[in-house]
Design a protein with these regions (language model features):
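Periplasmic/extracellular, small/polar-rich flexible segments of pilin-like filament-forming proteins
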Residues: 58-147
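Short, charged low-complexity linear motifs
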Residues: 11-20, 47-50, 77-82
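Conserved hydrophobic beta-strand within the GNAT/NAT acetyltransferase core sheet
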Residues: 9-12, 53, 111
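N-terminal single-pass transmembrane signal-anchor helix
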Residues: 1-33
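Alpha-helix exit/C-cap motif
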Residues: 36-40, 48-70
Length: 147
C-alpha cells in the first residue's frame, strides 16, 4: 500500500494557529514602534526649532510665532525675524507643528498629532517644548516616558 504525500488537516491547522499567534503579537508591537519613531522625529524637529528660536532672539531680540505647519518664515531680515526651515515630510504627515508666544520673552513649540498618530498615540498626545527646555505632553503618560 502506498502512502499519500502531503499535509494532514490537523498539521495545517496547527501551522495556521501558530502564524495567527505570532501575528497577534507582532503587529501591535510593530505599530507601537512606528508610533514611537514618528514621535521621535517630531521631538527632534522641535529641538531644532528651539535652537533656531534661540538664534533669532540673539539676532532680532524677539521670538518668532508660527501657526502654519510647513510654512515657517524665511531667513531673518531687519524687518522680519524668521526661522528659515520647513517641516520635514516625516513629521508633517503625523504632526502639526506650531510656535506660540505666550509673552514677548517666551515661546511654546507644540506638536499636535494627526491621522494615525492621533488615534495610536493617546499616551503622549500633544508634545510641547518651551524656551527653558521644559518638555511636556497632554496625554495620560509622563513627559519622561514620552520624551
Amino acid at each position: 500500500m502506498t502512502r499519500n504525500k502531503g499535509f494532514t488537516l490537523i498539521e495545517l491547522m496547527v501551522v495556521v494557529a501558530i502564524v495567527g499567534i505570532l501575528t497577534a503579537i507582532a503587529v501591535p508591537s510593530y505599530l507601537q514602534h512606528v508610533i514611537k519613531s514618528n514621535r521621535a522625529a517630531a521631538e527632534s524637529f522641535m529641538l531644532q526649532l528651539s535652537n533656531l528660536e534661540e538664534q533669532v532672539i540673539l539676532d532680532m531680540r524677539s521670538y518668532v510665532a508660527v501657526s502654519a505647519n510647513a510654512n515657517f518664515p524665511n531667513a531673518p531680515t531687519a524687518a522680519s525675524p524668521g526661522l528659515n526651515t520647513t517641516v520635514p515630510s516625516s513629521v508633517s504627515k503625523y504632526y502639526n507643528i506650531t510656535i506660540t508666544l505666550p509673552t514677548a520673552a517666551n515661546y511654546l513649540i507644540t506638536a499636535t498629532p494627526i491621522g494615525s498618530q492621533l488615534t495610536g498615540d493617546t499616551k503622549c498626545a500633544n508634545l510641547t517644548l518651551d524656551q527653558t527646555g521644559a518638555k511636556g505632553i497632554s496625554g495620560t503618560s509622563s513627559a519622561t516616558d514620552c520624551w
